[in-house]
Design a protein with these regions (language model features):
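Short, well-ordered junction/capping motifs at the entry into regular secondary structure
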Residues: 4-19
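Polytopic alpha-helical membrane proteins, predominantly small-molecule transporters/carriers
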Residues: 1-3, 30-320
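Short, small-residue-biased leader/transition segments that mark boundaries at the very start
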Residues: 15-29
Length: 320
């Protein structure tokens, strides 16, 4: 959640923000591996674990990073087109729903009470629908103010958010499959600890970033093409905020993978997907994206917040 706040504060284009934050993320993952992943009495150290990981586990974790990176780039583009309070709840919310199902079905270990998990997911789905209705009513209210191009741009942003959400729903399970989720202290041979799996995941992000960012910079979804010189023209303070956001994201994500060994991948993944609420809060209260909307829009947004929080709460207690 804090990662989103730092990235929003890191003023710049989506590619500049993501590149800087991912540099911070890789750096944070490296430090985590050589500290938390290497100290202690039990289990394999980070370096020893990295040496024995099978090629299948490496490919799975790296593929998760590549997919995550692509989904984030598309989600950032959708945010610039449709607005933060619309794009993030749609993209991340869809990723939450599909991701929970994916992790529950395809990742081993005790996943918790399916009734509570999928009831929580159902509430999140209703919250997403309410968000879409609120966005539509807001759009109808502003129809006289917007041009056809503006409406088309917003729709394009929503489509990108949906694609990003579908892609994002798959990355967690790919990384989890590279780990022995039933025994983090002494993982089976060829499988990784959370620290090693997340390092490989971050490598996939970093390497693919050069390809994906180059394409998006040359063929942007909106605006004029830019070069890498634009990135280096940015202020150091701007880059450092992005790096800090990446470090926060890296620490939060590796803790999520560690937690999956105790509470199950589907629950751990869901609890790490509180991003839509923070994004919606920023969109509503900071950027005033719904300012001047009808009272029904405000009611729908309030219900969305309540249902999303209750849904996450049900998922959180599913293991107990």
């Amino acid at each position: 959640m804090l990662y989103i706040c730092f990235c929003v504060l890191s003023v710049g284009g989506p590619t500049e923000i993501l590149t800087t934050s991912f540099v911070g993320g890789v750096r944070g993952v490296e430090e985590t591996g050589f500290t938390l992943g290497s100290f202690g009495e039990g289990g394999r150290s980070f370096v020893d674990d990295l040496k024995q990981v099978s090629s299948a586990s490496v490919l799975s974790a790296v593929a998760g990073g590549i997919i995550f990176n692509l989904s984030n780039i598309l989600l950032s583009a959708s945010t610039s087109l449709a607005g933060l309070s619309i794009a993030f709840p749609v993209g991340c919310g869809l990723a939450l729903v599909l991701g929970v199902v994916n992790n529950y079905l395809f990742v081993g270990g005790d996943q918790g009470d399916p009734v509570l998990i999928f009831s929580g997911v159902a509430l999140v789905m209703v919250a997403l629908i309410l968000n879409g209705v609120a966005a539509a009513k807001k759009g109808n209210g502003e129809a006289s103010k917007e041009t056809g191009n503006a409406a088309s741009t917003a729709k394009k942003g929503v489509v990108l958010a949906i694609i990003a959400g579908v892609l994002m729903s798959t990355f967690y399970a790919l990384v989890a499959r590279a780990m022995d989720v039933t025994n983090f202290e002494n993982p089976a041979e060829g499988l990784a600890t959370p620290y090693t799996a997340f390092f490989l995941f971050a490598v996939g992000i970093f390497v693919s970033n050069f390809l994906f960012n180059t394409i998006v910079m040359k063929k942007p979804f909106e605006g004029e093409p830019v070069g890498y010189d634009t990135y280096f023209k940015g202020k150091l303070s701007t880059h450092m905020v992005g790096v800090l956001g990446g470090c926060v994201w890296g620490l939060g994500t590796v803790l999520s993978y560690i937690a999956s060994g105790k509470i199950g991948a589907s629950i751990s993944y869901a609890l790490g997907q509180g991003a839509p609420m923070i994004a919606a809060l920023w969109g509503v209260f900071i950027w005033k994206e719904f300012k001047g909307s009808k009272s029904i829009v405000n009611i729908l947004l309030s219900l969305m917040f309540v249902l999303f929080i209750v849904g996450l709460g049900m998922i959180a207690v599913a293991k107990s």
